[in-house]
Amino acid sequence: MYLSMFYTLLVPCVSILNENFSPTSIMENMSSPATGLQPIRCKAAVCRKPGEPLVMEEIMVAPPMGHEVRIRIICTSLCHSDLIVWKMKDPPGIVPRILGHEAIGVVESVGKDVKEVKEGDTVIPTFMADCGECKDCLSNKSNLCSKFPFSVSPGMPRDGTTRFKDLNGEIINHFLFVSSFTEYTVVDVANVVKVDPTIPPNRACLLSCGVSTGVGAAWRTANVEKGSTVAIFGIGSIGLAVAEGARLCGATKIIGIDINSDKFETAKKFGVTEFVNSGSLGNKSVSEVINEMTDGGADYCFECVGLPSLVHEAYACCRQGWGKTIVLGVHKPGSQLSFDSLDVLHLGKTLIGSLFGGLKTKSDIPILLKWYTDKKLELDKFVTHEMSFEDINKAFNLLIEGKCLRCVMWMNK
């Protein structure tokens, strides 16, 4: 999560715009005759121009359609992917848009076909769907829903339309099926996880994206074994979450690799035991140094930056015979990776991508929350700042300046 947090969420063939998207359809759906629900007028932070401060304004939020849930947001946290898309002038960037995808809230109303949650339930919205019906969701081998695949569409997953408009009637686009920088949002029920309401919301909201991605990559994707050696390329928020996951799995040596030595002190709190400054190795490559430190290679290597060159370095220093390289950061779409075919054949290594840490949202997020209540998963150390939603642009500045890990914003404080 260094070069591009946004691209840590992308897969190589991402769908940018839903072909069914119709700007006029939202104008026809701002009320729901089937349920009698009406639009809600509320406050939102709207991205009006790329890279410029978000505009705090009042918007209208339509009632939920059949399989949708309207949520009152309690608090939301800021992720680098929000920052990256906020700057984008070209697709998948689009304005006006409501960003935000790490949040927790309370169900205000549900569509007529929703059975899974009800009004008053506490829920976490997620950018990953878990429909519970498709072949992928029914399998324990994948967390990639084929019915509602991951996309950066500006609309809802089922019909591509939006549930937001401003007070002038102009449509406002969604982001990652969540759009949490608003007091109320509408999310498909496939992207909603019911959670224990007693868990502090300023901690539970972190599991919508970043922390789950890193911890899950160590736990679910890599299946890190007790006593193993782990190398993490990039120790920003995602890399630190990987370290936390590796610590929970019992790894004994966790090596953090970054160009900023100042990060090591913070990384120690997350379980990182050794540090390598990749910018001060002289004539040696990072992979050479890691191979020397681990007597032949780390059992697990995690690439959390988004540079193809680091994927190669990570693969080069994972142990032959059983080493795994897990890719969490992906460079710009179209970037290529190339490997010597004989190395692939002879070395017995595994290279795998990990979206949302391989977690199934509806079954695995509750497990992570249980680990938190059992004082195993330490969420507190990820939160460096808390503030009012009104100060969201201050939160952006903190992230831009590299002064925060996670900044949580409360809607009513």
Model-derived segments and spans:
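Glycine-rich beta-strand-centered segment in the early N-terminal region that forms part
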Residues: 62-76, 89-138, 143, 151, ...
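C-terminal hydrophobic helical "lid"/dimerization subdomain
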Residues: 4, 20-40, 289, 296, ...
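NAD(P)H dinucleotide-binding glycine-rich loop of Rossmann-like/cofactor-binding domains
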Residues: 131-233, 281
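N-terminal Rossmann-fold NAD(P) dinucleotide-binding loop
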Residues: 239-240
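Short, flexible surface segments
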Residues: 116-119, 213, 226, 321
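Glycine-rich phosphate-binding loop and adjacent beta-alpha segment
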Residues: 250-251, 261, 268, 273, ...
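Short Gly/Pro-enriched turn/cap motifs at secondary-structure boundaries
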Residues: 35, 60-61, 94-100, 172-177, ...
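Adenosine-nucleotide cofactor-binding segment
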Residues: 226, 232-235, 247-313, 334
